[in-house]
Amino acid sequence: MTQHMIEIKSPYFLREESLASPADFAAVFGNRNPLVLEIGCGIGDFVTQLASSAPERNYLAIDIYNKGCNKTCNRLEQARLTNVRVMRIEARYLLEQFLATESLAAVYINCPDPWPKKRHLKRRLVNERFLQTLLHYLQPGGELFFSSDVADYAHAVTAHLNQIKGYENRLPVPVALDMAGYPLSKYMRRFLAQGQSIHFIHHRRNPQHTCETAAPQPVHRGFRTAWSANNG
């Protein structure tokens, strides 16, 4: 089914054609505050809470769904925040095309599609290849936050992180069932109200780590990039 396209006219919305490669986000925000990325912003509940609590940081919220981007922009306008921008773009394409290496202070990925069927596991966004790529774009000491309502996905991500030199766990356990002070999206709150669990991961790029692997392979534009068994 083709999603009805909403023309987004909000000043919070960034269009690809308005950006250089890599983009100058200091110019976009009008300052050089640390840049934080949220992958999969949904309707914008999480990033609105996060940006409100840390106005000294800039936030780029992305999603592949036009409707979600529009709702996020509307929510930001209501909150009158100035430190958030929204893009409709696929995460891997954003990293390769518009972000400079070591440009991100933090990345948040909350409850991405778990693709629970065994034959679809290779479609998960957060796999070993993606985490290796992400390491290039995190600043030394840059943080990675991941959450999932599917325990198997969270533990798979932990296993991938343990295989990659350069990440270090910031929690006393590999996967936590609670994280003090962590904003909860509407989806998370609804899930918890049903008596289910959210599984949290918090790693960072080791400040002493130098990325010695080859630069990430180019990613072609699109909201459904090619999947392969080699993606992890």
UniProtKB/Swiss-Prot annotation:
Q: Does the keyword S-adenosyl-L-methionine apply?
A: yes
Mind telling me which GO cellular component terms the entry cites? tRNA methyltransferase complex
Which InterPro entries did the record assign? Answer: SAM-dependent_MTases_sf (IPR029063), tRNA_(Gua-N-7)_MeTrfase_Trmb (IPR003358), tRNA_methyltr_TrmB_bact (IPR055361)
One MF annotation (Gene Ontology) recorded for this entry = tRNA (guanine(46)-N7)-methyltransferase activity
EC number(s)?
A: 2.1.1.33
Q: What does this protein do?
A: Catalyzes the formation of N(7)-methylguanine at position 46 (m7G46) in tRNA.
Q: Which protein, by its recorded name, is this?
A: tRNA (guanine-N(7)-)-methyltransferase
Give the organism the record lists: Syntrophotalea carbinolica (strain DSM 2380 / NBRC 103641 / GraBd1) (Pelobacter carbinolicus)
Q: What is the lineage of its organism?
A: Bacteria, Pseudomonadati, Thermodesulfobacteriota, Desulfuromonadia, Desulfuromonadales
